[in-house]
A protein has these predicted regions:
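Short active-site neighborhood of thiol/selenol oxidoreductases, capturing the structured segment around
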Residues: 12-15
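Local cysteine-cluster metal-coordination motifs and their immediate loop/turn environment
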Residues: 17-30
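C-terminal scaffold of the Radical SAM
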Residues: 2-10, 30-54, 61-328
Length: 328
């Protein structure tokens, strides 16, 4: 890759819509599928990458690549390597030595060999979807890993040489208390070495998800396992103060980083930087044009990525309104 220093910063998002089992709260475009489907999807994804008109990116520098899902670590590591080879070759003129390249991983789905392949492919940042250090809470929201699974994956990551590791956490989970939330934060901050970055999100019960239906059914029977708004707010404020005491600084609503370890990709969104997306349901926001791919995996594999959907031309007023909103 060329070490470029372009004036315009660009982000890239790559969507891998597969997982071993969909979590109860997830409303993202994702599904469990066979390796046959995985391979066909990866082939279509690489076709989309290679079909992008890279000539229109003159003057840009690719500052970040984020491989999300789904669970990207649920597909063969060789597929991830193929994707990164396509990115580095097709976008060679805008890739730089300091490009941040992140892959989302589910604890328990990574091996030492997978991590070696990721590093060889140029990936330099991992994001683990832990959510909780309490096994009963993980089971309640349909996560397939345990706290011990996470600790093993975290150890393997550092043994493989990854020094930039994010840990995703969630609060206001069913049956979660302030005490168990405090325990999760304490256990994560006690890891050696500490994560360079922690994200803490309040659970949102998205309509149409199994967890939302379950909670609604329980509430109809007079059972409410969710925290009230005051407790939710208290959990958030506790995370802010506790993580500050552990050396993290908050640079965005849900993100906390050690000094100089902020996520470039996260900052790009909050600073309204341009980005391009590849994969099913992936969106692009470049210039005055915003568009996305189909949400249908089969249609995407069949070549629907060639015809973008929901195309929107933004005015200067639209961009100013968005900038003000994101800055609130």
């Amino acid at each position: 890759m060329m070490n470029t220093d372009k004036n315009k910063q660009l982000g890239m998002y790559i969507h891998i819509p597969f997982c071993i089992r969909k979590c109860k709260y997830c409303d993202f475009v994702s599904e469990a599928a066979s390796d046959f489907v995985h391979e066909n999807y990866i082939n279509a994804l690489i076709d989309e990458i290679n079909g992008y008109d890279a000539g229109q990116l003159e003057g840009y520098g690719l500052r970040s690549v984020f491989i999300g899902g789904g669970t990207p670590s649920a597909v063969k590591a060789e597929y991830i390597s193929r994707i990164m080879t396509a990115v580095k070759e097709h976008f060679a003129d805008i890739c730089g030595h300091f490009t941040e390249i992140t892959i989302e991983c589910n604890p328990g789905t990574v091996t030492a060999e997978n991590l070696r392949i990721y590093r060889d492919a140029g990936i330099n940042r991992l994001s683990f979807g832990l959510q909780s250090a309490i096994d009963s809470e993980l089971e309640c929201i349909g996560r397939i890993h345990t706290w011990d699974d996470f600790k093993n994956s975290y150890r393997l990551a550092h043994e493989a040489g990854f020094k930039n590791v994010n840990v995703d956490l969630m609060f206001d989970l069913p049956d979660q208390t302030m005490d168990t939330w405090k325990r999760t934060l304490a256990d994560v901050c006690a890891l050696e070495p500490k994560p360079s970055h922690i994200s803490a999100y309040s659970l949102i019960l998205e309509e149409g998800t199994p967890l939302a239906a379950q909670i609604e059914s329980e509430r109809e029977r007079g059972i409410d396992r969710m925290a009230d708004e005051d407790t939710d707010r208290a959990m958030y404020h506790y995370a802010q103060s506790y993580l500050a005491g552990e050396g993290y600084h908050q640079y965005e609503i849900s993100n906390f980083a050690m000094p100089s370890m902020e996520s470039i990709h996260n900052l790009s969104y909050w600073e309204c930087k341009e980005y391009i997306g590849f994969g099913v349901a992936a969106a692009s926001n470049k210039g005055d044009l915003r568009c996305r791919n189909t949400y249908d995996i089969d249609r995407y594999i069949a070549g629907a990525w060639q015809n973008k959907e929901d195309i929107e031309h933004l005015t200067g007023r639209d961009r100013m309104s968005e900038f003000v909103f994101l800055g609130l």
